[in-house]
Design a protein with these regions (language model features):
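N-terminal auxiliary segments of SAM/dcSAM-dependent transferases
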Residues: 1-24
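Conserved alpha-helix/loop element of class I SAM-dependent methyltransferases that forms part
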Residues: 27, 44-62
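Class I SAM-dependent methyltransferase SAM/SAH-binding core
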Residues: 65-69, 73-123
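A short acidic, Gly/Pro-enriched loop at the edge of an enzyme's catalytic core
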Residues: 122-133
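A short SAM/SAH-binding and catalytic strip from SAM-dependent methyltransferases
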Residues: 133-145
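A short glycine-rich, Lys/Arg-flanked "PGG" loop and its adjoining helix->strand segment in the class I
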Residues: 147-162
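Short, glycine-/aromatic-enriched active-site segment of Class I SAM-dependent methyltransferases
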Residues: 168-188
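Conserved Class I S-adenosyl-L-methionine
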Residues: 212-269
Length: 269
C-alpha cells in the first residue's frame, strides 16, 4: 500500500494545476468549463474520448445518482454533472488527487453537484442501494481482491443498477514493462483476464450486458508516435511524474499482448 500511495502522490498539486492553467492562458479566477480541462483530468487510457464512450454505454440519466470509483481528479464526474446535471459521488484513495479534484470542482462551479470522499473502493462510506450507476476507469488493476471490489460495488448499487468500467486485463504473457501508469513495479499490478472479470462479477451477483476488447481500436487511434504533454502544459504530466516512460510502457505492453484494454457494462441482479 505504501508503494501505491507513493505512485499516486502529487505533492503541491493545487499549485501545479493553477500554474498549468495560467501557462495555457486560462484564468482560474474565472469559471472554467469541464471541456477546457479535458486534457488534464481524465487519467485513464483513452482520456476524455474513453470517458464519453463509456458514458454512452452506461446510459446514465439526469435523475441518476452516480458513483465514480477511483475518481482521480474527477474529470468524468464533472463531465457527468455538466452534461447531464446528475449528482456524483467520488471515492478516491490518494489525498493529493482528492485535493486536486476539489479544486477543479470549485473552478468549474460544480462543487454543489459533486462530493469527493477519500477512501478505499473495498470499504466505501455509502449505504446499501445508494446509487443508480457506478463507473470505474483503470482502477481495478491496483486491487488484488476483485471479489471484494465487485461485491462492494454491488452493495452500494440499487437493484438493477449499472456498473460501467474500463480496465486493463491480463494478456497472454506476464507484464514486464515497468513503470506503468498504474504501477511502479509488479507488486501493485493485479491484472486478471477479461474472462475472469466476467466470471467473478457473475459470482458476485452481476449480469453481463456487454464486455468488449478495445485494444486494437485504441492502438490504431492513438498511433505509435503519440506523445504526452510536457510539464507546464495542460495535460497529465502536470501531476504524473515520468509520464512519457509510463505511457510508452503501457503501449508496449498492449502491442506485445501482455495486457488488453477492455470495457463493459454489468447490471446488479
Amino acid at each position: 500500500m505504501a508503494s501505491l500511495e507513493a505512485h499516486y502522490s502529487a505533492r503541491d498539486i493545487d499549485a501545479r494545476i493553477l500554474a498549468a492553467l495560467r501557462a495555457v492562458g486560462l484564468n482560474p479566477d474565472k469559471r472554467l468549463s469541464p471541456e477546457e480541462l479535458g486534457a488534464l483530468d481524465h487519467f485513464h487510457t483513452g482520456g476524455l474520448r474513453a470517458s464519453l464512450e463509456l458514458l454512452e454505454l452506461a446510459q446514465i440519466r439526469a435523475e441518476h445518482r452516480v458513483l465514480d470509483i477511483g475518481a482521480g481528479l474527477a474529470g468524468p464526474a464533472r463531465m457527468l454533472a455538466s452534461k447531464l446535471g446528475c449528482r456524483v459521488d467520488c471515492i478516491e484513495l490518494s489525498p493529493d488527487y482528492c485535493a486536486g479534484a476539489a479544486l477543479l470542482n470549485r473552478l468549474t462551479g460544480l462543487e454543489d453537484r459533486i462530493a469527493v470522499h477519500r477512501g478505499s473502493a473495498l470499504e466505501m462510506p455509502f449505504a446499501d442501494d445508494s446509487f443508480d450507476a457506478a463507473g470505474m476507469q483503470n482502477v481495478g488493476m491496483n486491487i488484488a481482491d476483485k471479489r471484494q471490489l465487485y461485491a462492494e460495488i454491488r452493495r452500494v448499487l440499487k437493484p438493477g443498477g449499472r456498473f460501467a468500467f474500463q480496465e486493463m486485463a491480463a494478456g497472454k504473457t506476464p507484464t514486464t514493462h515497468f513503470p506503468l501508469p498504474w504501477a511502479t513495479d509488479p507488486s501493485d499490478s493485479h491484472l486478471v483476464s477479461a474472462d475472469e472479470m466476467r466470471s467473478v462479477l457473475g459470482e458476485c451477483g452481476f449480469t453481463t450486458e456487454c464486455l468488449e476488447d478495445t485494444s486494437e481500436e485504441h492502438l490504431n487511434r492513438t498511433g505509435a508516435n503519440a506523445t504526452p504533454s510536457a510539464p507546464g502544459q495542460l495535460g497529465l504530466a502536470v501531476f504524473v511524474d515520468n509520464l512519457g516512460q509510463k505511457a510508452g510502457n503501457a503501449r508496449r505492453s498492449l502491442e506485445d499482448g501482455q495486457v488488453r484494454l477492455v470495457r463493459g457494462v454489468f447490471l446488479k441482479n
